Amino acid sequence: LHWDNPKCDRKALKRHLDYAVKEGAVIMVNGDFFCLMQGKYDPRGNKKDILPEHNKANYIDAVIEDAVDWFAPYANHLQFIGYGNHETNILKRLETDPLRRFVDLFNYTHKPENPICLGGYGGWLTVQFKPNATERKSYTINYFHGSGGGGIVTKGVIQNQRRDAMTEGADCVWMGHVHELYTMVVTKQTLDRNRVPILKD
């Protein structure tokens, strides 16, 4: 999201989040919820890339507190946030955890039905569905924020292929970091419960 960066398209973001609320969907974020690059010890920082409302002596606090207010309408839908390189960079340089602070303050302030769960830089998510009163299904996601560059031509697909090749048991491999948007279906051969060869997407 890089929510606090002036280049974040807040109108488009709000449109997507409002649609999630309308559809009763769960909102999950795979890292880089914040940008937070304009602090004192960040060599990438540039004060022209900071919103006026965040240009304060307590820059990190201002961003976190503003985000807690801005995301309030999505309190009962925003259920998971993982770390990205922007958040881990703040933890490394400033010895404070911006996501933990956001999640704790958000959950305390808005008291959502299901508190936001703070994940890691990578991990597993299992989403459970109940299509009817007697049936239960699950969908397993292996998430990893990502690392390295995406590549002008490949758009990060090579990293996804590597991740998928070393991951077993996931219905979906979810990566971010390279600022590209695509979905890729990979068909694999496997055996079903009766040891019959099948193809699975």
Predicted regions and their residues:
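Core catalytic region of metal-dependent phosphoesterases/phosphodiesterases
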Residues: 3-119
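Short beta-strand scaffold segments in enzyme catalytic cores
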Residues: 122-126, 183-184
